Structures are given as structure tokens and as C-alpha cells.
Design a protein with these regions (language model features):
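Glycoside hydrolase catalytic-domain groove-lining segments
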Residues: 171-179, 186, 190-228
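Acidic, His- and aromatic-enriched active-site or binding-groove loops in soluble protein domains
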Residues: 27, 31, 137-153, 180-199, ...
Length: 427
């Protein structure tokens, strides 16, 4: 799952040293990987960002090791050495990580610590060398060796916090309790993206997994998702679904959440959604509709009513139908779930006309949104959801070409497919 790889970071920030036992639910980490979660936004809304507040982030050991890797750092898979996975019993690997932590962040202090992620490479292989097998590894379970590696670091660097992941070969919890400065990310990928997910198998599996890890690990973060990763430019009404998820995490005593959005890439309605998500992480009982309306009144004074009415209508439709919101979905799937073609075309047209009466920051924001929505309408034409209209298609193409003048609007999805390449398909 590529969504667990994004944002590979080597860097770090200063954070207050804190034990997991002192942390209230959802109070320790509010990570938002979205383009609107800027440094200024983080300061005003108390959010976090992986580029700024992790010493090592994601599946990043390969970047850390770099050219200093030796053969014994890599796993034995099916009896052969594989450079696609690490051996977490390797003394050389431990020495390399230890050296990096000490060189970059030192021992930490009572007031300074780093969050450091120690995760296997993002695949389903596990090392079964003699040492890893002796620790309890199997071909499908790397938890024993990985947690032993992390525990060793945590003991040597008690001021820093070390995180692993409940994902792929480390999904199974350890059999012994982990230190207070060790945490784990539990992926919510199997928790269906819909407003009411409580009657699904994925819900039961997720809850059981969090509770199982909770027995052995006192610091639990959730790695969550809030975007259609196949289409950043089209509307994605995730806020009521995210509110339901955050309420669940609070009930499960989860201390932190990382919400994986579109990273640095522009996505439709992201500025408003990032604002509301930040409020919901502070208080999952926040009134979503009022928060949306308040944001638009402040930042889009001339078009606030139009934007609020349309977007809230999408959220209400997603709630009333309880249809699955596709994390990887086509235009047809989005229209089956929440988009109404005629309603969308009418909204985009009205917004375009209204935008011409705006000035300053509102005009700039609307220009970006209308550019993104031109892609949505082109996709409706391309997939046959709209009858071909060469004049309007030409107009949408010209609008979308303006993406090159806008910050962050180069890619249309997680895989990095460019808008320019998409436009070439229309030539």
C-alpha cells in the first residue's frame, strides 16, 4: 500500500519529552500531510507535519543507511539474501542506526526528544535468518525481530521516542510489553471510508487490532487516510467520515493520528478540509457544517454561500447513502458514491461566474479551485458521463492548462501522473 510510504523524511524537530501514560486521547500528535498544513497553519492550529516533527519518518531506513549498507544488513528470504528487506537482528544495521541517531539528535534531554520511525521496507517479506528465527520471526511475521531492534534503541536512548508499525509483516502485536518510549502506528486502511462503518468486518478487525496492540504498547497512533489517491483534483467529501473515525480513535484511547492527504500536491477543497480536520482532531464533537461555513465566510466572503451549500450537500449525500468513499477510485465510482454530474456542472458554472466579481486572496483561491474542477469536468466527458461538447471541452482544457501557473498543481494523483501528460491525451 503506497499510502504508507509517502513523506519519507530525514530531519527532525524539537518536541517535549513525554511519557505515554500522561497523554489524553488524541492529544499528542495531530499530523496532517496536506498542502494547506503550512508552518504558519501548524503554529496557529496546533497541527503537526512529518516534514517538520520527525527525526526519521516512514519506511526510511534505506535512505538512512544509504551507501554504507553491508550485505549482512539485509534479510534472508526463502534462503537467499534479499536487498528488498532488512535483517533486524543485524548488528551492523543497529550500529548504523545508532550512529545516525547519536550524530543527528544526541541523547535527548528532559525537554528535547525526537520521534524516530523504525519500519521494515514496505513489502510483505520478513527475514528468516537463524537469529531472526530464534527471536520468533516467520516468513510472514517480522514483529519479533523488529520490536527487539526498537526496544534496544529505546533502552539506549530513553529520551527519544521510537515508533514501529502494525502493518504487513509487523501487524501481529509482540508477546511482551514495550517500553514507555516505544509506540506503534496502526493503519486504518481496512476501516471502510464511510460515515457509519460499525457494521463492517473491517471495523471489527481494526478495533481488535488496536486493542491487541494496546495490551503491549502504551503509545498508539493511527495512520489514517482522507483523499482519493487516484484523483486529487476532484471533490472528496470526507469530513463526516473522518469525524466518525476520530470519535472511534478517542474511544480507543489512541494518543495521536497521522492523516495522509495529498502531501504537497494541490487537492480540491483542501484548504477548508485541512482547517476542519484540525478542529476535529482537537475536538471530534466539533460542528462540521458550522466549521465549513465559518471558514468560507472568512476566506471566501463573496462566494461563501455557494461553496458551503455545494460542499455540504456532498457531505450530506455521503452520510445519507453511507456509500463507500473510494480511496482509490475512478470518476464513475465517485459519481456512484456522491457526485451528481448535472449538479457539479451547474455548480462549477455558477462558481466561475461568481469568481469574476471577487478580488484579492479569494480570487486567487477560486482560480486554483476552478482549475482543478476543470479536470473533473473533463473526466466526466472522457468517461461518457457527459455527452461530448467540443466547445466546452476546449474551454475546460484551456482552464486546466493554467495549472502550471499555480503552486503545487502539477500532479493529479498519488502516483505522480502529471496534468500535462493528461492534457496531451486530449490533443
Amino acid at each position: 500500500m503506497a499510502a504508507l510510504v509517502v513523506g519519507v523524511v530525514l530531519g527532525g524537530c524539537h518536541s517535549n519529552a513525554q511519557t505515554a501514560q500522561s497523554v489524553d486521547p488524541l492529544s499528542e500528535y495531530h499530523g496532517l500531510y496536506t498542502p494547506s498544513n503550512t508552518e504558519a497553519f501548524q503554529a496557529s492550529m496546533h497541527t503537526n507535519h512529518p516534514d517538520y516533527d520527525w527525526g526519521v519518518w516512514g519506511h526510511n531506513l534505506a535512505k538512512l543507511v544509504k551507501d554504507g549498507a553491508t550485505d549482512d544488513m539485509y534479510a534472508i528470504v526463502d534462503g537467499k539474501r534479499s536487498h528488498k528487506q532488512f535483517c533486524f537482528s543485524s548488528q551492523s544495521l543497529y550500529n548504523k542506526v545508532r550512529e545516525y541517531v547519536l550524530d543527528q539528535y544526541g541523547w535527548g534531554t528532559a525537554d528535547y526528544s525526537e520521534r524516530i520511525s523504525i519500519m521494515p521496507m514496505d513489502n510483505k517479506t520478513a527475514c528468516t535468518c537463524d537469529d531472526c528465527t530464534a527471536r520468533g520471526n516467520t516468513s510472514t511475521n517480522a514483529t519479533p525481530a523488529v520490536t527487539a531492534f526498537v526496544e534496544r534503541l529505546a533502552e539506549e536512548f530513553p529520551r527519544h521516542k521510537f515508533f514501529t508499525s502494525a502493518y504487513h509483516t509487523t501487524n501481529t502485536p509482540p508477546t511482551t510489553s514495550l517500553a514507555a518510549n516505544v509506540g506503534t502506528f496502526v493503519s486504518s486502511i481496512k476501516l471502510p471510508m464511510r460515515v457509519d462503518f460499525t457494521k463492517t468486518e473491517g471495523y471489527n478487525e481494526f478495533v481488535q487490532n488496536v486493542k491487541a496492540w494496546r495490551k503491549q504498547c502504551s503509545r498508539i497512533y493511527v495512520w489514517d487516510y482522507e483523499r482519493n489517491y487516484d484523483d486529487y483534483l476532484s471533490p472528496f467529501p470526507c469530513l463526516l467520515a473522518m469525524q466518525a473515525r476520530f470519535k472511534l480513535y478517542r474511544d480507543l484511547q489512541v494518543q495521536g493520528v497521522f492523516v495522509n492527504g495529498s502531501g504537497d500536491d494541490y487537492s480540491a477543497f483542501d484548504d477548508m478540509q485541512t482547517y476542519v480536520l484540525a478542529l476535529l482532531l482537537d475536538n471530534p464533537d466539533t460542528d462540521v457544517h458550522e466549521s465549513i461555513a465559518r471558514y468560507y465566510r472568512e476566506h471566501y466572503p463573496q462566494t461563501a454561500d455557494l461553496l458551503t451549500t455545494y460542499y455540504w450537500g456532498l457531505e450530506q449525500r455521503a452520510q445519507s447513502t453511507n456509500h463507500l468513499l473510494p480511496l482509490y477510485g475512478s470518476m464513475q465510482e465517485m459519481c456512484e458514491s456522491y457526485l451528481d454530474v448535472k449538479e457539479f456542472v451547474s455548480f462549477r458554472s455558477q462558481l466561475d461566474k461568481a469568481s469574476k466579481l471577487t478580488v484579492g486572496d479569494e480570487r486567487k483561491r477560486l482560480n486554483a479551485l476552478l482549475t482543478a474542477l476543470a479536470y473533473t469536468q473533463l473526466e466526466m466527458y472522457r468517461t461518457g458521463l457527459l455527452a461530448k461538447d467540443e466547445e466546452t471541452i476546449g474551454e475546460m482544457r484551456e482552464i486546466l492548462k493554467g495549472h502550471s501557473e499555480l503552486k503545487g498543481m502539477n500532479n493529479r494523483d498519488e502516483s505522480g501522473h502529471s496534468i500535462d501528460d493528461y492534457l496531451k491525451k486530449w490533443e
